[in-house]
Curated annotation (Swiss-Prot):
Limits of the ATP-grasp domain: 104-318
Amino-acid positions noted as binding Mg(2+) 1 in the UniProt annotation, renumbered to this chain: 273, 288
Cofactor: how and how many bound: Binds 2 magnesium ions per subunit.
Renumbered residue ranges of the record's region Disordered: 319-339
One example GO MF annotation: ATP binding
Name of the featured protein: Inositol-tetrakisphosphate 1-kinase 1
Binding annotation for 1D-myo-inositol 6-phosphate: 16, 58, 148, 153, 185, 187, 271, 290, 294, 297
Cofactor or coenzyme needed: Mg(2+)
Chain positions covered by the region annotation Catalytic specificity elements (CSE): 208-243
Sequence similarity: Belongs to the ITPK1 family.
GO biological process per UniProt: inositol trisphosphate metabolic process
The keyword Magnesium belongs to this UniProt entry's keyword annotation: yes
UniProt organism field: Glycine max (Soybean)
Length: 339
């Protein structure tokens, strides 16, 4: 008996992303639910391929945006995950976190926000003490652009004002907040939300702050998500997983934040990093938001993504049926009048 075909999803991903995300385990599980995952050939126009019920992508550039628009014109009912315009908001570390201020979560004891931060566009501003005098050191220096490139992941913990001249603008200076050396990574897949805890930068004591760091006034570090390669992803998870009794944020609180971000950003596939401010027991700070993160690092990602794909296909089918009914209604009325 032939397998029931629910939908075809074309995926357009960079080679590294494809290798880490499109695993045999995901392809097999999706196929068992009637979802076929098909690679988009980057050497051919998207509009000449398929047809696809959905395009799952993480490619950038004007040419790719044009291809998506042409595909949408040909197949207006096809689902694009996600809209390039919505994704681009996350490419700027200032605009990505501005959305947090738009959230309204009521009737909860927990509070949330973002660390104090400023953007420095040029060297002259960087060397002007008045530009950053409101910040308390240490600060984390991050490139303003967050486009997934290796350059965008180059960050540093800056302990002293004198170390600022080692940085290259445009950058964002974000106050470092002690958080117990634990970061909570919240994965969002449509309405599915999964929160895991990972090791983070250790707290900085008052003595270390006074001395300007342990041994250096500026300490470079790699973003945690870049530590793993495809081959050592499982080892990465074991390394970064915390077996201690660190308390997780309340599930309902995390789900509320995730839902608010999903609606405000108009995105389905992203994760956000949260820390618990060590100065307050129930104060949480969102420090980063990433589009289409490394879902393979999330335990059981295959089941979550497959269920999401099925939900996307079901919603698409329901919308098409509704459109068909609305399109037939005037015709049926006209025929009844003629009779």
């Amino acid at each position: 008996m032939a397998e029931k075909r629910f939908g075809v999803i074309g995926y357009a991903l960079a080679p590294k992303k494809q290798n880490s995300f499109i695993r045999d385990s995901l392809v097999s599980l999706a196929k068992s639910r009637g979802i076929e995952l098909v690679r988009v050939d980057s050497d051919k126009p998207l509009a000449d391929q398929g047809p696809f019920d959905c395009v799952l992508h993480k490619l950038y550039g004007d040419d790719w945006k044009r291809q998506l628009q042409e595909f949408h014109t040909l197949y207006p009912n096809a689902v694009i995950l996600d809209a390039p315009e919505a994704i681009e908001r996350l490419h700027n570390r200032i605009s990505m976190l501005q959305v947090v201020s738009e959230l309204r979560i009521e009737d909860r004891p927990e509070t949330f926000g973002i660390p104090k931060q400023i953007v420095i566009y040029d060297k002259a501003t960087l060397l002007d003490p008045q530009a950053w005098e409101s910040l308390k050191f240490p600060v984390i220096a991050k490139p303003l652009v967050a486009d997934g490139s290796a350059k965008s992941h180059k960050m540093a913990l800056v302990f002293t004002r004198d170390a600022l001249n080692k940085l290259k603008p445009p950058i964002v200076l974000q106050e470092f907040v002690n958080h117990g050396g634990v970061i909570f990574k919240v994965y969002v897949v449509g309405e599915h939300v999964r929160c895991v805890k990972r090791k983070s930068l250790p707290d900085v004591s008052d003595e270390e702050k006074a001395l300007g760091g342990v041994s250096e006034d500026l300490m470079s570090f790699s973003q945690v998500s870049n530590l793993a390669t495809v081959n050592d992803c499982d080892g990465y998870y074991r390394l970064m997983h915390l077996d201690d009794d660190t308390e997780m944020p309340p599930d309902a609180f995390v789900v509320d934040i995730a839902g608010g971000l999903r609606r405000a950003l108009k995105l389905n596939l992203f994760n956000f990093d949260v820390i618990r401010d060590a100065r307050y027991g129930n104060r949480y700070l969102i420090i980063d938001i990433n589009y289409f993160p490394g879902y393979a690092k999330m335990p059981g990602y295959e089941a979550v993504l497959t269920q999401f794909f099925c939900e996307v296909m079901l919603k698409k089918k329901q919308q098409e049926e509704q459109q068909q009914e609305e399109g037939n209604a005037p015709k049926e009325k006209e025929e009844s009048l003629q009779a």
